[in-house]
Regions:
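Short beta-strand-to-loop transition segments that serve as allosteric relay/switch motifs
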Residues: 124-132, 255
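Regulatory loop-to-helix N-cap segments in sensory/regulatory domains
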Residues: 130-140
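Helix-loop-beta substructure at the N-terminus of cytosolic sensory domains
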Residues: 21-52, 182, 200
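Regulatory input/activation interfaces that engage signals or partners
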Residues: 43-46, 53-106, 115
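Conserved small/polar residues in nucleotide/adenosyl-binding loops
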Residues: 253-260
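A short beta-strand signature within small-molecule sensing/ligand-binding domains used
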Residues: 104-113, 235-241
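PAS-family sensory domains
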Residues: 45, 51-78, 138-147, 159, ...
Length: 262
């Protein structure tokens, strides 16, 4: 992340711990981009509190971009109508739903302050291309609910959950998503997640089933390869877990969301 490191070092007052936190956020934020169907921009404050710098940007794999250009390296000056300014000054999430036009495209924008140790250290903007928003459905509704949970976690310093983890080979939202309630019951499984479990031998659906017993039934030898299945799949940590049998191998990436497991 040369742009992030260079701009933060040259232009901001952020300390090493904050810089590391933002680097970990950028490593993990594709999940937020994909579940919100949004482009994300990370803005950091200049030493001059009236200026903000774009240090990272990501586009969604689940929908069309809302931003034609790469804005990394650009700066914005103080504007009392700017969502970045409003979010930074208020430490509260801000949004506009008036379909602001960007290159002729109606775009909804959220600004999420990144709060650590009681202070706002950055702002993440979510830009959603409204022309590309998919028709409402079970998958879309669950993705947006997950995005709202992740946004709240980001706002309150709980996302990323496991700083320093290597996400390079981790599954993506497009590979499949499963939501698990605190009881362990599956409340939603995306089509690709269901397909992955079908390759493991699942005959029915996942909705309404309990994740841990289902995995143990499909992969009875799992304990013999040293997997701490219960702790991992209950989502108490952000971690990766291989589940496998003679038919297939799946990699699960689990995340604990305070009020609703992802």
């Amino acid at each position: 992340m040369p742009a992030l490191n260079r701009i933060v070092a040259d232009r901001t007052r952020l300390d090493d711990a904050d810089i590391t936190w933002l680097e970990d956020l950028v490593d993990d934020w594709q999940m937020l981009a994909d579940t919100s169907f949004s482009d994300l921009i990370l803005w950091v404050p200049d030493r001059d509190p009236n200026v903000f710098w774009a240090v990272a940007q990501v586009r969604p794999d689940t929908g069309p971009t809302a931003l034609e250009d790469d804005v990394v390296g650009e700066s914005v000056a103080y504007d009392d109508e700017s969502l970045v300014t409003e979010a930074f000054m208020s430490a509260e999430m801000c949004e506009t739903s008036d379909n602001k036009l960007s290159a002729g495209i109606p775009v909804d924008i959220w600004a999420i302050p990144v709060v650590r140790r009681g202070e706002v250290i950055a702002v993440v903007e979510r830009h959603t291309n409204q022309m590309g928003v998919r028709a409402p459905g079970n998958t879309e509704d669950n993705y947006l609910e997950i995005a709202d949970i992740l946004s709240e976690m980001l706002h309150h310093g709980r996302f990323p959950q496991f700083p320093g983890s290597d996400r390079a080979l981790a599954p993506k939202v497009t590979d499949g998503v499963i939501r698990v309630a605190a009881t362990g019951m599956i409340t939603f499984a995306s089509p690709n997640a269901l397909s992955a479990f079908r390759r493991l031998g699942l005959a029915g659906d996942l909705d309404g089933e309990y994740l841990i017993p289902t995995v143990r039934e499909l992969c009875p030898r799992l304990r013999e390869v040293g997997q701490s299945l219960t702790l991992d799949l209950e989502g108490r940590w952000l971690t990766e877990t291989d589940i496998e049998n003679s038919d297939a191998t799946c990699l699960l990436y689990t995340s604990d969301a305070a009020d609703d497991s992802l």
